[in-house]
Amino acid sequence: IVGGTAVTPGEFPYQLSFQDSIEGVESHFCGG
């Protein structure tokens, strides 16, 4: 679902991962 509209599987073949590093420990905190 993009902007409230269904899309075709594979139409957007990528993902996003926001990550942070605190005191040398990397962690994922959000994605889309």
Curated annotation (Swiss-Prot):
It catalyses: Preferential cleavage: Arg-|-Xaa, Lys-|-Xaa. Belongs to the peptidase S1 family. Transmembrane segments: none annotated. Its main location: secreted. GO terms for biological process: proteolysis. SUPFAM superfamilies: Trypsin-like serine proteases. It is found in: Secreted, Extracellular space. This is Trypsin. High efficiency toward native protein substrates including collagens. Residues 1-32 form the Peptidase S1 domain. Disulfide bonds: none annotated.
